[in-house]
């Protein structure tokens, strides 16, 4: 599958998307550039599909990609939040878990911005 380079090496691009997916899971809505949001969408949807499966192998696959960050006041991390809170919401839904909303251009460089959030 073709992907945008976003002006980064492949390792930096992977690190960027790991951070963005983790932030999306924790906050459930993030603001980023339109191109990053479009590239992030299939990755985030894959994580939700794995979380819906719910088995140990799926949990390990998600944990290998998502950063280990505290997601809430109880000290639960992002992987736990994805499996316990977000995935059950989409139990009856087959794909289309995220939505991209266009925002105005960024101040400074006028880059087109967008919000990506869970439906």
From Swiss-Prot:
List cellular component terms (GO).
cytosolic large ribosomal subunit
Which PROSITE patterns does the UniProt record give?
Answer: RIBOSOMAL_L17 (PS01167)
Is Ribonucleoprotein a UniProt keyword of this protein? yes
Matching entries from SUPFAM superfamilies are given as:
Prokaryotic ribosomal protein L17
Give me any GO biological process, just one.
Answer: translation
Record-linked InterPro entries: Ribosomal_bL17, Ribosomal_bL17_CS, Ribosomal_bL17_sf
Extract the coiled-coil ranges from the record: none
Q: Keyword Acetylation: yes or no?
A: no
Note the subunit structure: Part of the 50S ribosomal subunit. Contacts protein L32.
Q: Fetch the NCBIfam families from UniProt.
A: L17
Family as reported in the entry's similarity comment = Belongs to the bacterial ribosomal protein bL17 family.
Q: What name does UniProt use for this protein? A: Large ribosomal subunit protein bL17
Please name the source species.
Answer: Brevibacillus brevis (strain 47 / JCM 6285 / NBRC 100599)
